[in-house]
């Protein structure tokens, strides 16, 4: 498996656990390299339009980020870093949903990420949890709490009748991977 300085990742069946111990130069460069594609999706990032270039994308990110409470900011950073880590370290997955909510300058509702598995051509619905060490808990206990929360959130979303979560997920994936017909077929089927 590839490595990224400052990032430790543990992959298990059905989930992955990531710890970022150092915001290294290598991680910073990966952030810069992937920023527009992560935020806007593959198609828009390659369009050449000024609004999808690096500097306007940084400004758009900060506009969304700076007005949020600390807990939401941590969640946004966790989701954003998940995009980077998946793009850099997991060869068998590609992110199929952009980070930015296209309808409003807020966080996305519903599923955090959609991943496309290049090995089995399936779409994975992904929930990201991030945070700091919980009071009175060690790293393992905090990780277990975050994983349990992610599992319960996914279970709830997958079993609720909120059609908007599914429509948003399909729309985001469709936009992000519009140039790859086989991806779109998987998502829409």
Which stretches of residues belong to each language-model region?
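Interdomain/boundary linker segments immediately adjacent to catalytic/signaling cores
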Residues: 1-76, 80
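Charged, terminal alpha-helix-loop-beta segments
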Residues: 16, 72, 89-93, 149
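Amphipathic alpha-helical segments that form well-ordered structural scaffolds
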Residues: 80-89
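Conserved catalytic cores of phosphodiester-cleaving nucleases, focusing on short active-site segments
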Residues: 86, 113-115, 123-130
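A short acidic/basic microdomain associated with nuclease active sites
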Residues: 89-106
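Short beta-strand or tight-loop elements
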Residues: 109-111
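Catalytic cores of nucleic-acid endonucleases
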Residues: 130-189
